[in-house]
Design a protein with these regions (language model features):
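Acidic, metal/ion-coordinating pockets
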Residues: 20-123
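Bacterial N-terminal signal peptides that target proteins for export
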Residues: 1-9
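Bacterial N-terminal signal peptides
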Residues: 8-18
Length: 123
């Protein structure tokens, strides 16, 4: 029994030493993040982005921030108004529905993560 106890203690100490040495190594890396909140598309905004053929182009609206979005490692935007599809009429407050083309234009601007979980998710 004593031999089993000593063997267990030695094994525990060896593994503790090995684990401690692995933790001592510095593997830290830095991540730069930019976050934008409340990309809320009211009717005046999507009407401004609408072309005569019914398509939408939101890219000019994001052109002033494109360079600021490009430099961080991760760019996050909170898409406040839902993209409910083109079969449902586009609308603003209180029951938002935003043209789906805004998603592609947000990605083209340089955003990596688009959040859709917010208080307008079920509009």
């Amino acid at each position: 029994m004593y031999r089993y106890y000593i063997t267990s203690v030695v094994i525990f100490l060896v593994f503790s030493l090995i684990c401690g040495m692995a933790l001592a190594e510095d593997h830290s890396e830095k991540l730069s993040v930019v976050a934008v909140g409340d990309n809320l598309i009211h009717p005046v905004v999507y009407h401004d982005a609408q072309h005569s053929d019914g398509t939408f182009n939101f890219k000019p609206m994001y052109s002033n921030i494109k360079k600021d979005i490009a430099s961080p490692d991760l760019a996050f935007v909170n898409q406040e108004s839902p993209l409910g599809g083109d079969d449902i009429p586009f609308s603003g407050f209180k029951r938002f529905n935003t043209p789906s083309q805004v998603a592609g234009d947000i990605v083209a601007t340089g955003f990596d993560v688009i959040n859709g979980a917010n208080n307008h998710s079920l509009d």
